[in-house]
């Protein structure tokens, strides 16, 4: 009986996974720059504590310096910014995707424990934002021809889901506050890493041989009223075009003479 139930659950999970991937494929952009811009904006939004942590602190009456300090001291261990920077792009995307999946689970647990009234609409907004980020992360991996590698789960925990003992309400509130604080900090790190992706691509374009060649070439145009036009291009040598009124165009192959001498 248990084996049949496990098989049914596994089949349902795989079906939902395939459906979510199909929906993500249908809604994916073909522009990497557009996806990167969206991910940066989404990370900035979710990294802002006003989107979730601050409303939670006010709702749970934790808005004192000591209680705020307790939140940071009980923060949940998310992947650090230095760790994220050292990851390859595929592994980074996989880590973000998997971590946000865990965050969704913790938010659902948080709702069940505390928020049985519609007094915390920010929670639903945060959930929709996370789903949007995960979709764009999947699309970015697909656009880069990378499969989302699922990394080994890190040893993290959340005050919203600790159930080894029956904690008092206050400690549970502090634990959940620490989880939200760690989540915002993680998303801020994700946004900074995504901005480094953008800076790296811009720097690569600036340092391309074509741009360097153009940068080393200088054009100077000199016009004399009604008589002649001189166009000079310099990069080691100088070419001069002289056009006189009523005469044909003269184009020397190479010259180091001044326009005045040739005229």
Swiss-Prot record:
InterPro entries: 4_helix_cytokine-like_core, Leukemia_IF/oncostatin, Leukemia_IF/oncostatin_CS, OSM
Keywords from the UniProt entry: Cleavage on pair of basic residues, Cytokine, Disulfide bond, Glycoprotein, Growth regulation, Secreted, Signal
Signal peptide range in chain numbering: 1-24
GO molecular function, one term: cytokine activity
Disordered: annotated span: 241-263
Family, per entry: Belongs to the LIF/OSM family.
Name of the molecule in the record: Oncostatin-M
